[in-house]
Amino acid sequence: MGVVTVPESNKQSVAAKRAFRPSSSIRHTPQWPVSDVTSDLTIEVGSATFSLHKFPLVSRSGRIRKLVLESKDTNLNLAAVPGGSESFELAAKFCYGVGVQYNSSNIAALRCVAHYLEMTEDLSEKNLEARTEAYLKDSIFNDISNSITVLHSCERLLPVAEEINLVGRLVNAIAVNACKEQLASGLLKLDQSFSCGVPETAKPCDWWGRSLPILKLDFFQRVLSAMKSKGLNHDIISDILMSYARKSLQIIREPNLVKSDSDLQRKQRIVLEAVVGLLPTQANKSSIPISFLSSLLKTAIGSGTSVSCRSDLERRISHLLDQAILEDILIPANIGAMYDTDSVQRIFSMFLNLDECEYRDDDDDEEDAVDESEMAMYDFEGAESPKQSSIFKVSKLMDSYLAEVALDSSLPPSKFIALAELLPDHARVVCDGLYRAVDIFLKVHPHMKDSERYRLCKTVSCKKLSQDASSHAAQNERLPVQIAVQVLFYEQTRLKNAMTSGGGTGGSNQSQFFLFPNRSGSGMASGAISPRDNYASVRRENRELRLEVARMRMRLTDLEKDHVSMKRDFVKPQSRRRRYGMLRKLSRGLNKLNAIVLRFRSSQSVASSGKKHTEEKTNSERRFMFQKRRCHSVS
């Protein structure tokens, strides 16, 4: 027989018992041809030994011919054959005239072996090199799926595959065919737009994009770079990158396993940095979801990637911050606190620093088609403008984030204060969410410095608190005294404005009804009461409200005096018992003021119930109540 292949452990040379009889035609059989000529050449390839004949090999292989002439030895060692013993066996069968079946799995190895053994047309017509080249051009380069398979097989054939430019040609073929698929898909969609009821086809990459993740990182990078240079759609590139990242980044699936293996963590870090470097440059216009970018950032921080890689991800997330949810920005920290607030602070800062032109880029192509009158009615800085609505969404996201990280007892107050102070004042319409987060932080961190406590509470705009939040803040003992006084002041100002807008001529009845919609039993809401009675009822209610405002103003004056005296006392050294006594004293004063507010609300309900009293009786009763409360006021 012509060849014997054995493992290295049992390596032995067995001579052919029959000689080789040349054949002018190639036999389409995988078996070796029977020959009566004894083998006269032994070739070792890796762990296998081949007992062959010189004539069929030297007639087609230039390298074997040179080795036989130079060494004049019957034993040759070809340890550097691309593809190992399996590839050499196929090449040897080709030399013996045995038909070799080409496919996408072995064509790259055969092409590299033909180059290594120098099986060119100079030695024999239709040699292995020419035949493999013809198969590549006819069946591989024009099919994107086959090109990916062959390129994957080239990973174990380096550097020979690079020397013959097989890798470069395959990369270019994949990129060109991908662009052709994109063009064909676009033309098909255009054709379908003229017909009705025809479903849209899938994306061009749906059937071959899943094959790209089998490539190693360097080949994958070259393919994606070639696709970008050929003009492939960024959405398709994004889909390919997301598929590759999910299959290649094990840290996303098993973070604990990766952290325990330093070598695996290093490899994952290299893959992650490469994926981030291949992301489309226009992140704000790409189809990459923010959840994917967030997972990459969490992985980057956990695996210790470069600063530039993390900064790039933070910048991309900032462009899509108005689409984020709380889970997207809850980034775990490696050491110290539970969450990485520094990264989140940089993301929000970059969002605020975005140029206004970036918000208007999406509308540049549509401005010519929009009527000028409609554009004149559109206020870019209004509450419904894209920029302002995005800021409102981001402010709600920030409040939710602050409420979550406030539960971390190891978070330094300075970092929490920096986050609370980050957004501008116009970003929030109502500060209830921020107040809730601040209150949680004060409860979890009871030993804060007074200066830090006051600075943190200053971030809450008291005039933007709702009525319920103001009532809670007025009785909140964790807030500094100055903040509590501000809350009461703005609450009194709010009531004063309500009274001012409610008084006046009959033309203000409509606004007064809007301010007090619950008074359905009053003369304004009743159509059976005459205009004269209605006017008298309104005047009576106005007088009652003015009296209540006057009482609250006097009570507020007393509280301000208490505040001034307390500030003077705090400057001097004093015992903790005395300080707590003053706080309790002020708390009792605030509770009494809250009782005044409740009586004020009850007076409204009494006025709306239709009870009619004479002005003399009402004034005397009110005066008596006022004098009684003054006797119990806090000095």
Curated annotation (Swiss-Prot):
- Is Transit peptide given among the entry's keywords? no
Q: In which pathway does it act?
A: Protein modification; protein ubiquitination
**Record domain BTB: where:** 39-104
Gene, per the UniProt record: SETH6
- Ranges of Basic and acidic residues compositional bias? 612-624
Sequence ranges assigned to domain NPH3 in this UniProt record? 206-494
List the PROSITE patterns hit by this protein, alphabetically: NPH3
Q: Report which superkingdom the organism of origin falls in.
A: Eukaryota
Q: Which organism is it from?
A: Arabidopsis thaliana
Q: What is the name of this protein?
A: BTB/POZ domain-containing protein SETH6
GO aspect biological process, one term: protein ubiquitination
Stored Pfam families: BTB, NPH3
Keywords from UniProt, A to Z, are: Phosphoprotein, Ubl conjugation pathway
- Cite the residue spans of the region called Disordered: 604-635
Similarity field: Belongs to the NPH3 family.
* Gene3D superfamilies cross-referenced by the UniProt entry: Potassium Channel Kv1.1, Chain A (3.30.710.10)
Q: Cross-referenced PANTHER family, in alphabetical order?
A: OS12G0117600 PROTEIN (PTHR32370)
Its domain comment says: The BTB/POZ domain mediates the interaction with some component of ubiquitin ligase complexes.
Q: What does this protein do?
A: May act as a substrate-specific adapter of an E3 ubiquitin-protein ligase complex (CUL3-RBX1-BTB) which mediates the ubiquitination and subsequent proteasomal degradation of target proteins.
Look up keyword Phosphoprotein and say if it applies.
yes
> Where do Basic residues bias regions lie?
625-635
In-chain residues carrying the UniProt-annotated modification Phosphotyrosine: 435
